[in-house]
Amino acid sequence: MCGIVGYIGYDNAKELLLKGLEKLEYRGYDSAGIAVVNDDNTTVFKEKGRIAELRKVADSSDFDGPVGIGHTRWATHGVPNHENSHPHQSSNGRFTLVHNGVIENYEELKGEYLQGVSFISETDTEVIVQLVEYFSNQGLSTEEAFTKVVSLLHGSYALGLLDAEDKDTIYVAKNKSPLLLGVGEGFNVIASDALAMLQVTSEYKEIHDHEIVIVKKDEVIIKDADGNVVERDSYIAEIDASDAEKGVYAHYMLKEIHEQPAVMRRIIQEYQDAEGNLKIDQDIINDVKEADRIYVIAAGTSYHAGLVGKEFLEKWAGVPTEVHVASEFVYNMPLLSEKPLFVYISQSGETADSRAVLVETNKLGHKSLTITNVAGSTLSREADHTLLLHAGPEIAVASTKAYTAQIAVLSILSQIVAKEHGREADIDLLRELAKVTTAIEAIVDDAPIMEQIATDFLETTRNAFFIGRTIDYNVSLEGALKLKEISYIQAEGFAGGELKHGTIALIEEGTPVVGLATQEKVNLSIRGNVKEVVARGAHPCIISMEGLEKEGDTYVIPHVHELLTPLVSVVTLQLISYYAALHRDLDVDKPRNLAKSVTVE
């Protein structure tokens, strides 16, 4: 949620900042702004709405300079409007600030230090910048004032501060909110993620929580909470900028659906040794082997992937596994086993709720593993181990290729641990994943069929239901989430056997019901459930698998191993959801009220 960019160097900053913000659009936002500094002045441009509107305003002015900060805002304190947009300035105009996160004690700070100060916005951010001015007026240097203010803040924040009387510096701090430092020759940048500033550098340094960073064009000084200078190596962000472009596709979501076969091949390659055997780090294997129970912590689509992963971990590896919603777990932790292993699944590696759980389990000394798409992300840094998805940048808000990548990686982990436990495999996983890849390609080629299904079943409906049994039920949850995320159709996923326990009361004439029928032992049962809703006027869509199909099924996916069917059947639901939104003329990649990375609790 939200995004920050900053530049200090020799080039004019305005265009670099605007392009950087455009690369952060996928994170979700409702307003955007930049502040640019030159020898004469600090000028702020900000607008409610899309960055295209901000660009019009900024481009209408000739003002530019070699230093600046930018921000995309997702409203938390105060409605989306011009006044609440970032950057914010102090009363005397000397200090300018951008901020991601939520300050929990801003009202207390406002009451204690800022009595009589006139505020323009409703935001917690303006309190921060006014506090910097307050302590500056008490005689503190800008660095001292900034450090003092940061020490008072409770909550999450990533901060970038400009001082009109010190035009050669950006002051930076973070806690529980992502922010990176980009390194260049004669310039430096800050960004919420590396993608934003790949236009100028691929070399980055991490910023850790509670650190103060003094950024100048020719040097960077990192200080810990005690004021000690910290030396830190840089790393190269292994991202191809072209991976973040739509290319020939109309939308990022469609591109990312089509990329799934390539992602599967990349995962097979990355997790295979020279002899053609599955491989992961031995330390990870040892910790999973020693665990008497695995607790999967995730949110949204990653949670649904975790539900599928539970099937692998229990059926193949023989490890009891629980899957928990991160935002609930952190406040309602169950009784834990003696030797738990926590597995955190997050596409971005920045999910605030999951990180909150990780902080608590780290305090308890429990082992942890992060499954993420982003090397160097907060979860990957703070967990004991990391397994990467190798899916490439996922820009569309609605996750597609990350979901299938998460399931594939979980299947590999489970099979390796099964072997370590001496459990006989009933599957040649690499061969089966290759079959899955071919099956996904076939479904992607059938995209026109999915478009017709979407048109027939979902274009004008008010609600829709997805039903399945066993592992198909887990996929039905993800199918419903995809549809509601981007088409704004009220959609719910249910276990087929639960229909008679309340849900069937919602069925009326023409209600679309998508039934997944890819599991042999429950094939007749789920078809019976479909007949029940048809008898009450529902409009059915049955997605089955070769070998289990019946006459009249809407679509039949190629045959794959039953436990791997989620990797294939979900692609049909992704495409159906995409075309349902497309035919409703909606913003597929940036649905309303949603953010790609949920970085506040």
Curated annotation (Swiss-Prot):
- Which residues participate directly in catalysis? 2, 596
Quick one: where is this thing mainly located?
cytoplasm
Domain Glutamine amidotransferase type-2 intervals: 2-218
Location within or outside the cell: Cytoplasm
Listed as disulfide-bonded, the cysteine pairs are none
Q: Name one GO cellular component term.
A: cytosol
Provide the E.C. number(s) assigned to this enzyme: 2.6.1.16
Q: Which organism is it from?
A: Staphylococcus aureus (strain MRSA252)
Ranges of residues in domain SIS:
284-423, 453-591
The name of this protein is: Glutamine--fructose-6-phosphate aminotransferase [isomerizing]
Q: What SUPFAM superfamilies does the record tag this protein with? A: N-terminal nucleophile aminohydrolases (Ntn hydrolases) (SSF56235), SIS domain (SSF53697)
**Would the keyword Transferase turn up in this protein's UniProt record?**
yes
Which reactions is this enzyme annotated as catalysing? D-fructose 6-phosphate + L-glutamine = D-glucosamine 6-phosphate + L-glutamate
Q: What class of enzyme is it?
A: transferase
Entry's Pfam families? GATase_6 (PF13522), SIS (PF01380)
Biological process annotations from GO:
carbohydrate metabolic process; fructose 6-phosphate metabolic process; protein N-linked glycosylation; UDP-N-acetylglucosamine metabolic process
Q: Does the keyword Cytoplasm apply?
A: yes
